[in-house]
């Protein structure tokens, strides 16, 4: 597999690549080496307005929202096939801009991205309305209709996969969308927007605006012509989108907010080796940058020493290295600020009682 890739860096509005209206750009950094990968077009408020307007026109006038379910299904299946054909390219982008191990990108993220689009495509002609019980002289129907224009706000930990989780149901039900990728990981989302056109998704159905949460994200959250916001990210930012909705048009807000879960091992656990396998996988996979990562380990005192010894040994199998190396299991964290936050949790100055079973690996 080639280790070179060309990056598209412009906004996608109405099926066209466009620079930001104010001419601003921001840098996407490779977290593995700190080098600039690309300068990405930064959307302004005017660009957000244009993207929403184009999405609104595409929704109201069709053809996507008015397309026969069987035809929409064909187009979405073709979209999945096009993404699949470019899986290596997208995997390279994600490894380079997010620091994700290339093996995970190829074997987990890209298949999940394709399968999500494909699953929702197959569901299109299997969605039925209902007839409710009523008087014989009355026909009472429950009809499901598309919502309209959806703003989809993506996180940086699974860029392509999260784009698919948003795009699948949004497109399958006839809506149009304005995608806002995380500023750390814009490149694969832009490319997916380009591939949508290749697959035959009509212009204006998928738009991509890049930039920062306090400007682009806020503009989408407050926009009066956005019917729904679908957000994945922090609880703090999720609350902001609820406020934006309350202060404007009461748009529907769908939140998937991050959280951390404890990994609990009871004293009567019979297979500690398997428990140690799961414990290491749950915290180290995807560098722990996962909303279901088990960042706390709650262990019964009677098995603590034995389990920790197993975990320390198994952690040695998690090779830290270049995300483009197929042998790497742990790449870099997304950015320096995030690394600093994680390292603060094991700061001996702040936690004087802390005893580390092994040395931190920071390069």
Q: What are the residue ranges of the model-derived segments?
A:
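Terminal low-complexity tails and localization/encapsulation signals of metabolic enzymes
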Residues: 1-40, 74, 78, 127-153, ...
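Residue-level signal for inorganic ion chemistry
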Residues: 34, 72, 94, 174, ...
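Structural signal for hydrophobic packing residues in well-ordered secondary-structure cores
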Residues: 59, 63, 80-87, 91, ...
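Hydrophobic packing residues within well-ordered alpha-helices of enzyme cores
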Residues: 117, 189-192, 220, 241, ...
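ALDH superfamily catalytic-core signature
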Residues: 228, 236-354
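Single conserved hydrophobic/aromatic residue that forms the stacking wall/gate
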Residues: 351-363
């Amino acid at each position: 597999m080639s280790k070179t890739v060309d990056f598209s860096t412009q906004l996608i509005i109405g099926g066209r690549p466009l620079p930001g209206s104010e001419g601003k750009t921001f840098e996407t950094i490779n977290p593995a080496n700190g080098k600039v990968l690309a300068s990405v077009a930064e959307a302004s408020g005017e660009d957000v307005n244009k993207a929403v307007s184009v999405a609104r026109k595409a929704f109201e006038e069709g053809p996507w929202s008015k397309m026969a379910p069987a035809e929409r299904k064909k187009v979405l299946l073709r979209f999945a096939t096009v993404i699949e054909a470019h899986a290596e390219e997208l995997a390279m982008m994600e490894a380079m801009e997010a620091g994700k191990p290339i093996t995970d990108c190829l074997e987990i993220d890209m298949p999940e991205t394709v399968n999500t689009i494909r699953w929702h495509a197959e569901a299109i002609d299997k969605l039925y309305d209902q007839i409710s019980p009523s008087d014989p002289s009355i026909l009472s129907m429950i009809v499901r209709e598309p919502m309209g224009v959806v703003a989809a706000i993506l996180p940086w930990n699974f860029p392509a996969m999260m784009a698919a989780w948003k795009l699948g149901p949004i497109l399958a039900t006839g809506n149009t969308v304005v995608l806002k990728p995380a500023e750390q990981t814009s490149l694969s989302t832009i490319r997916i927007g380009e591939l949508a056109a290749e697959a035959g998704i009509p212009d204006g159905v998928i738009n991509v605006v890049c930039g920062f949460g306090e400007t682009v994200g806020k503009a989408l959250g407050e926009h009066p012509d956005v019917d729904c916001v679908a957000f994945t990210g922090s609880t703090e930012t999720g609350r902001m989108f609820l406020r934006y909705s309350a202060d404007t048009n009461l748009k529907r807000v769908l939140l998937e907010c991050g959280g951390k879960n404890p990994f609990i091992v009871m004293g009567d656990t019979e297979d500690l080796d398997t428990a140690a396998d799961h414990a290491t996988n749950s915290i180290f996979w995807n560098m722990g940058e996962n909303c279901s990562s088990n960042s706390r380990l709650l262990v019964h005192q009677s098995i603590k020493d034995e389990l920790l010894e197993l975990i320390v040994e198994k952690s040695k199998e998690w090779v830290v290295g270049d995300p483009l190396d197929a042998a790497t299991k742990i790449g870099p964290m997304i950015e320096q600020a995030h690394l600093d936050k994680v390292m603060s949790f094991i700061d001996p100055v702040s936690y004087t009682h802390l005893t580390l079973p092994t040395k931190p690996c920071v390069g």
